């Protein structure tokens, strides 16, 4: 099978690794052929700042800052490569506790979806969320993709053909490439999506700016030592925005710094981010970051949380990310062109599930495709040059399983992110009162999150395949 992957970000690199691991070998013995197209340099040591500000296929290649990978996403990585999981955790920090706070630093509610952190060094039964840099997560994935598989070339068009190989064309006029399967891992504003709706001149499902923008950066842990609970991720809400912070790395000598089941002593930095309402979407390429920092200080000048006060005194804005989402697509596949990750469903940061859902997508589709391809090979009657039916069957089950699950996460995230919008003083304190009351019932508050992070996409796939068989 000839496979083209558009985008070498988190989803693109992971689906290459998943397909390479799971796809059965053809009866002919000839290996499947993979090519990954990415518009930007993907050298593992190249940072987002080095790549410039042009359009790209992979949001992870241009957006800096941090992210949280929840247990459901970490388990995808664990099943793929346990050594890679340890490297990713080593480069980040295991967070067992989620603190919801008022702007003055008062804890209103606490969630511990993996249970109370163990104090005896034995670790927990369930993985914690791992906070890490986007680049750090991507770097570990990229290290495992051979350099000769990735071609630095910008795609101009993808055409899904019902009666032959799908066609990928390029901006530089290079000869078009053909493939049985084209994976669109090209992000929120990707081109692969257009192949699913060929009769439309304009994008029928354009991304939507949500009226919220985030900025973020890092400060030395020494500045806030004693004010950040070990093993915590903190969410601070007020009437004119939102602020979050987390320990960004473990101490270098921590014995369990590569374990998501343990909480380690902190390292040298703390990550922070702030989300605020703004009607018109700012352009991260041209915005004046000094002006943004000035606005940040003005917005939070009356907030008394000690960590926020230190951040405002010393920090610089290093990343900026407007909140975009995409309306639910009626399909993620057409004639062998399949979308994964943000290309299929862009989730707001409030979900805490952007990277984890992309990881679930790629494992899910890879397992379904491997199953149907294996059955086709075993039957002996399969035309080795015609994979349309196999891809269609796998994609249908992939969408049937994933679309309702992702839609539920999106609906909940959109409700939650309303807490980040500007409020009157009365609305602000009603929010505090509600959260304080919910905080008295931690099991009730934690249950939905616990169900989400304990979701096992591989088991769900195998259950569905067992029922069908």
Where are each of the predicted segments found?
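Extreme N-terminal starter segment of soluble prokaryotic enzymes
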Residues: 1-4, 32
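Conserved N-terminal helical subregion
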Residues: 2, 18-20, 57-64, 68-218, ...
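Conserved mid-domain beta->alpha element of the FAD-binding
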Residues: 5-21, 183-184, 215, 317-415
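Glycine-rich FAD pyrophosphate-binding loop
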Residues: 8, 20-63
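Conserved Rossmann-like nucleotide-cofactor binding loop
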Residues: 11, 15, 42, 189
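Alpha-helix termini
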Residues: 20-31, 54, 199-203, 224-226, ...
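C-terminal helical "tail/cap" subdomain of flavin- and related membrane-associated enzymes
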Residues: 29-30, 351, 367-469
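Conserved FAD/dinucleotide-binding core of flavoprotein oxidoreductases
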Residues: 107-112, 118-133, 172-176, 218-320
């Amino acid at each position: 099978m000839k496979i083209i992957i558009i985008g070498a970000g988190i989803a693109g690199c992971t689906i290459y690794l998943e397909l390479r691991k799971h796809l059965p070998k053809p009866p002919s013995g000839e290996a499947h052929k993979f090519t990954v197209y990415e518009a930007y340099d993907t050298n593992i040591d190249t940072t987002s700042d080095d790549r410039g500000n042009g359009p790209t296929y992979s949001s992870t290649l241009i957006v800096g800052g941090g992210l949280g990978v929840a247990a459901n996403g970490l388990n995808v990585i664990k099943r793929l490569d346990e050594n890679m999981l340890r490297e990713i955790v080593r480069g980040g920090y295991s967070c067992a506790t989620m603190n919801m706070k008022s702007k003055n630093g008062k804890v209103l509610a606490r969630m511990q979806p993996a249970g109370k952190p163990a104090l005896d060094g034995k670790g927990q039964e369930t993985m914690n969320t791992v906070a890490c840099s986007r680049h750090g997560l991507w770097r570990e994935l990229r290290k495992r993709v051979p350099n000769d598989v990735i071609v630095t070339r910008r795609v101009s068009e993808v055409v899904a053909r019902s009666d032959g190989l799908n066609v990928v064309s390029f901006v530089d006029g290079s000869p078009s490439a053909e493939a049985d399967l084209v994976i669109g891992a090209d992000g929120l504003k990707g081109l692969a999506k257009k192949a699913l709706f060929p009769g439309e001149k304009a994008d029928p499902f354009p991304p939507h700016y949500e009226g919220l923008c985030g900025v973020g950066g890092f400060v030395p842990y020494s500045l806030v030592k004693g004010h950040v609970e070990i093993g915590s991720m903190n969410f601070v809400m007020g009437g004119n925005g939102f602020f979050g912070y987390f320990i960004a790395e473990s101490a270098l000598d921590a014995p369990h710094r590569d374990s998501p089941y343990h909480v380690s002593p902190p390292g040298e930095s703390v990550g922070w981010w702030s989300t605020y309402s703004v009607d018109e979407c700012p352009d991260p390429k041209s915005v004046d970051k000094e002006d943004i920092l000035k606005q940040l200080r003005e917005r939070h000048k009356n907030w008394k949380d000690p960590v926020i006060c230190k951040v405002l005194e010393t920090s610089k804005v290093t990343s900026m990310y407007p909140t975009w989402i995409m309306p639910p697509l009626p399909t993620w596949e057409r004639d062998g062109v399949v979308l994964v990750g943000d290309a299929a469903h862009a989730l707001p940061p409030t979900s805490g599930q952007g990277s984890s859902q992309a990881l679930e997508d790629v494992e899910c589709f890879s397992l379904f495709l491997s199953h149907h391809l294996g059955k086709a090979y075993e039957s002996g009657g399969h035309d080795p040059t015609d994979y349309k039916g196999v891809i269609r069957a796998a994609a249908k089950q992939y969408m049937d399983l994933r679309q309702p699950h992702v839609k539920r996460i999106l609906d909940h995230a959109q409700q939650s992110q309303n807490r980040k919008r500007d409020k009157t003083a009365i609305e602000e304190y009603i929010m505090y009162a509600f959260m304080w009351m919910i905080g008295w019932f931690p099991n009730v508050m934690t249950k939905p999150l616990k169900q989400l992070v304990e979701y096992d996409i591989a088991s769900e796939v195998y259950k569905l395949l067992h029922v069908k068989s």
